[in-house]
Amino acid sequence: MLARAPPPYFNFPARNNTICNRNEIVRLFRNGGGVVARGAGFTRRPLETSSSYDDSTDDGFVIISAADKENEFAPPPSSDLLSSIPSESARRNGSRSRGLTASFGRLKAQKVKALVGKVTQKKQHMSHNEEEDEDDASDENYSADEGFGSSSILDLMRKKLAMKAIPRSGKSAERNEVKRASKVRESRESRRDLDRLEGDDEDVDEVSNPDRFTDNQRAGSRSSYSKGGYAANSRGKGDRLSVARDLDSFEGHGRAIDEVSNPRKFNDNERAESRSSYSRDSSANSRGREDRRFVAKELDTFQGRDKAYDEVYNPRRFTDNERGLRGGSHSKGSDTNSRGWGDRRSVVYTRDMDDWRERNKTKDTRETGFFSRKTFAEIGCSEDMMKALKEQNFDRPAHIQAMAFSPVIDGKSCIIADQSGSGKTLAYLVPVIQRLREEELQGHSKSSPGCPRVIVLVPTAELASQVLANCRSISKSGVPFRSMVVTGGFRQRTQLENLEQGVDVLIATPGRFTYLMNEGILGLSNLRCAILDEVDILFGDDEFEAALQNLINSSPVTAQYLFVTATLPLEIYNKLVEVFPDCEVVMGPRVHRVSNALEEFLVDCSGDDNAEKTPETAFQNKKTALLQIMEENPVSKTIIFCNKIETCRKVENIFKRVDRKERQLHVLPFHAALSQESRLTNMQEFTSSQPEENSLFLVCTDRASRGIDFSGVDHVVLFDFPRDPSEYVRRVGRTARGARGKGKAFIFVVGKQVGLARRIIERNEKGHPVHDVPNAYEFTT
């Protein structure tokens, strides 16, 4: 059995989806220019089957008819037969058997003779021009250099014989004639010249007189083109239709460009139908219709005539259902998108339009934008809970509260993420407490000594005290339940006594929680829900890994887990979805974003270019800037963030030297060097005081940025630039909190920090997140 030579290894061009750069389109329109048509880009990939080789049409590719393919160009045999053909080096070494060598030589000789004889007969009634003779000469020189024993001999002979058998007129004399396809990348100018030489064909008339042809006629002609034999019509009608499609796309004579220049003539259904029909077209129509639809879509997007872009500048024309439907289409993506990190088209970014609109609204409009359009009754709050919230002056839920209520009260594990000051504490407390109260009234569950029904883990004792204050406010307003805090710095005996009396909600830090679990004092057999507040900070605690493992191993399988955070970095998100793959992800509208009411000011403290750059000179420049801000913008409350405790103490000394008797300036330190009692006292004084004559300054480290709600803060000063962009969001988020909050942030930077801070502020001004957020499920509010 003789082995057949393998076919040549050809590539065919695949259409590239993009014909031009989007950023360049935007720049051209902003500068008053127009879109310049560019040649479509192509990528190449190897063919997988022999049949696909016959369908290839690129520079120098050969189109083989059915009869020729059966006779001269037979498809290759199976892989085992091809593997029996030795390489050229093996032939030189004589390692191949003599019988196979002789058989293979006779096979090639017979094939070559058959090809030469057939082509010689065909050449008698074929005309050739000078250009073809030059190509033949070049091919002869090239093939003469190759040895007959080369593995690519049939490939070279095919090209040579096929090029000699190609008539330039584009008209077929015989059905089985071997033709050469026109070059895909041939310029449009030459194609137009060719069309003019061939006369007023119907296809050319369609380009020059588009009004004479309806869309059905134009579509029918292109459909017939795609269904016809491309090998026979590639030089004639195929080229003319390619010109027609190019002119339709870039010169404005087609329906797609008319749709761009006259958008009012087309409704949304017609535009959607046209784009849907594009997706159903054959590959032969991709050159024309794809270009027209893509250009139309690009121009619609960047000129403001697309529905998505029009939604930004004309928000009143779109209802919440329409906007939610657009966002929901993103959430139905693949597993990769739901668990990955998205670009501008992720689910979370569907709400960016609301943020851009809010920046141009007045103060009163901005206040209403903080709350959801739904009421507490509409999201499912009970009468007792609504009464308790009403007493605390909560009339409507915030966005994150409305979004998280339904999955939390249903007992689903969730990741709840939104910006600082958005109301995340009540977003998980209200539904959890309501569910506990309903279960207690129905007799399904009840608190027992040493076994709380809800555990809240927080990173700091100050945040634990804040959560406890919220729990007691709800309890005193008509929804009774018991809550307590177990943290370091308090008498342990008192905490244990209260725990033995029975508690519904236990708030603890990871260290104290681990201690109670190891000592056997705390039991989790009755646990209904575990809440991890500021989970991104908890993962940075050395004791948290052990605390989380104890929590998972000791709690019932039916326990609910809630992970709450203002920032959700990639590594934290991956850890959560790996351990809890069934979590619902509730993303607020402003994750990783600063408040709309926040004003940011970049202060370059690098000094003069000729001055010496040292840490001491940088500190002196920051000191001068701080005193200048204090004198020119006197306010009631200011928080100053430093990276180190040592820097905090230096800043404290600056204020003490300015006002030793603290008649106008009152400084309150807040960092780990102080005892917990001192920190809580200073925090309480700073949050509850309303000074009228003097100004309060809280000098702190990042400990104060971890979830603590500082109400009424006017200014935030970043004396040291944060090491992490996520920390930037938490620091500046201490001001401009809530619906009516507003404030200013002054960022001191030196050296390379200037460029990084400028990019962050520019992104904030545009409403973009400081860094990406994951694609996730989202609930309509």
Curated annotation (Swiss-Prot):
EC number: 3.6.4.13
Any Pfam family the entry gives: Helicase_C
InterPro entries: DEAD/DEAH_box_helicase_dom (IPR011545), Helicase_ATP-bd (IPR014001), Helicase_C-like (IPR001650), P-loop_NTPase (IPR027417), RNA_helicase_DEAD_Q_motif (IPR014014)
Residues given in the record as ATP binding sites: 418-425
Keywords for the protein's UniProt record, in alphabetical order: ATP-binding, Helicase, Hydrolase, Nucleotide-binding, Plant defense, RNA-binding
Residue intervals of the Helicase C-terminal domain: 621-781
Domain Helicase ATP-binding: from-to ranges: 405-586
GO CC, one annotated term: chloroplast
GO molecular function: ATP binding; ATP hydrolysis activity; mRNA binding; RNA helicase activity
Residue ranges with Basic and acidic residues bias: 171-197, 254-274, 313-325
Motif DEAD box: chain residues: 533-536
Biased composition (Polar residues): 216-226
Acidic residues biased stretches: 130-143, 198-208
Enzyme class label: hydrolase
Residue ranges of the region described as Disordered: 72-103, 117-148, 166-240, 254-292, 313-342
Biased amino acid composition, Low complexity: 79-88, 275-286
Catalytic reaction annotation: ATP + H2O = ADP + phosphate + H(+)
GO biological process, one term: cellular response to salicylic acid stimulus
Purpose of the protein: Probably involved in resistance to biotic and abiotic stresses.
Domains as described in the record: The Q motif is unique to and characteristic of the DEAD box family of RNA helicases and controls ATP binding and hydrolysis.
Family (UniProt): Belongs to the DEAD box helicase family.
Name this protein carries in UniProt: DEAD-box ATP-dependent RNA helicase 50
Species in which this protein is naturally found: Arabidopsis thaliana
